[in-house]
Amino acid sequence: VAFEPLSLEEIQIIFIYRKIISNDEKGKILIENGLSAIAPMLRRAPDPEGEEGYTLFHYSLREHILKSQDMANSVQTAKEAFCELAMKPDDQEELTNYLYRTGIDHFIDVKDFKAAGKALLNFYWLLNLFNLGKTPSDINSYWSQLPISKQQIDACYLFSLMGKDHVGYSDGD
């Protein structure tokens, strides 16, 4: 469910955070052995910073995993873990850049639109997004995925810009 390749260290931090492995050499070896066991399904690829990480070899495998009933619980647990981590992106130094770059994507993925909106209104988060290579177009794309309601303080402006027939419009919160 990661939105970009993750390094061994980043994967290890996620597993430590979820208390799946210990924070020592044994935990690291367990991750290395696990990656070796599924190596035919993985490929190495750079993240936006040029750091090499692991990703699934084929996009179709990712889609299969995301849609498989057998994997539904594991996928949901992983999505929740990424969202929890993204709530405080500075807490895990090795993941900070990844969490700022993709945290809003993770919030939107689990339909936590409130968290996504709060991140988009957080100037420190926006500064990090721009410093990590995101553009105003990327920010606009995030906003376009969020529902709009009459309850928002800026609703009158949004409705005049996008219209009541906008795909994100709703009468609720």
Regions found by a protein language model. Give the residues of each.
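C-terminal leucine-rich, beta-strand-based interaction scaffolds used for sensing/assembly
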Residues: F3, L8-Q92, Y100, F107, ...
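Alpha-helical positions within canonical tetratricopeptide repeat
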Residues: T77, K114-A115
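Solenoid-repeat scaffolds in large eukaryotic assemblies
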Residues: G103, A115-A119, A155
